[in-house]
């Protein structure tokens, strides 16, 4: 209730999740999603629809924005952007996609290091230091550090 009452001033979006699809069925998941909207949720996340048709039904029958969890190799179908738009899905997440890619690449790097004693063979697959620092706005953080550092 506190989050709901104070969300306007900080731009918070409340996403309500239901796992009812897996346990008690799609009808109950949709019913709960609509109840969550009535209680103040902004977006509804029905976990584990089992087909594209179910995703379409969820987006049609829930009376507000729907989030879809797009996971490669998950229980739900992996859908294209066009399918999601056509279904009426308003927000899509890709949980663990980056982590899975990065972990695979890190494993390759460590295997290369173990086998050859060097990571140099993979230098062409790495960001330059300049590119890396730009991603993290390094200069901004150095300026903050310099402002507060005791010398």
Predicted regions and their residues:
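Alpha/beta enzyme core
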Residues: 1-94, 100-107, 111-112, 141, ...
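Flexible C-terminal active-site loop/helix
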Residues: 113-151
């Amino acid at each position: 209730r506190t989050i709901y009452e104070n969300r306007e001033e900080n731009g918070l979006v409340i996403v309500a999740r239901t796992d009812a699809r897996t346990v008690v069925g799609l009808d109950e998941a949709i019913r709960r999603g609509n109840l969550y909207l009535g209680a103040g949720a902004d977006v509804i996340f029905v976990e584990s629809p089992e087909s594209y048709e179910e995703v379409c039904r969820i987006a049609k029958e829930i009376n507000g924005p729907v989030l879809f969890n797009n996971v490669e190799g998950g229980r739900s179908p992996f859908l294209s952007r066009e399918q999601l738009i056509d279904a009426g899905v308003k927000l899509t997440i890709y949980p663990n996609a980056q982590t899975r890619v990065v972990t695979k690449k890190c494993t390759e790097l460590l295997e290369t290091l173990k086998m050859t004693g060097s990571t140099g063979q993979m230098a062409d697959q790495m960001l330059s230091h300049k590119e890396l620092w730009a991603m993290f706005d390094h200069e901004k953080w150095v300026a903050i550090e310099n402002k507060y550092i005791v010398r």
